[in-house]
């Protein structure tokens, strides 16, 4: 069976949305399952529903798995995404071939860091996205050099990218980027900005650049929420999907149908991003903190609240708990209490709480 690419996909008779050619508008540090099932899904919908007409270049932040870049490039950036779960009481198992990815580069391979810097000089580039794990946003003095190919840490790489852009456009204020951090730490955008400032100072970069980095660019803290199991582990299920699809897909991804992305940003940012017009579950808010509290206290809190009693009652998985009237009733009562206790606006309630 042939590997997925544009020609093979066309031969299967796939009739979903596909965008083959478009300028690269997004630089994404991270090529893992989560970003491809979450952020890249939103950009793909924005291409279809909002006419964004933009591609995403994936940059591997570490050198541990260079073959992933090879797999993605072999498939010309295409991969199959399955979103599964329950929505409005109905079972969902939706397939979509994601076509917003342009390619993937491992900057540790010969010549590939130059590709990253070339994109930094592009007029088309608008957005940087990152998910480099909780350990990715970190600064260690002396661990990365300005002329290193590439610098070691992710914040050092980003600082170098921003300096390349600053130099290419002679510090033009309108050439700054929107930087969306998805790492699972508090104030991820602010922490990333601090790290970049530390590297800029370590490297003795000029004050004019530091001013441009902090004022022309928008470092956004964000809250992400989607469960992403990733690859299908069952060989029989994988074989059945490949048979049904008519191709093999080494980058196939699976995520929960529920997903919400809350982006902390200034007035006007929502109009710069393509998501509002696309109608996807992405919000731009002045402060992400209350949204994070609601997520943790309602979604995570609900599970924590019933799991010990449910386990003692002989239940091992959440699905079975939700089929039990006693456990489900206890959880519903607890959710009502937390929903009423924490109010951060009607919109937030509707995104996370079933009681609105």
Regions found by a protein language model. Name each.
Residues 1-349:
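Substrate/ligand-engaging "lid" and interaction regions
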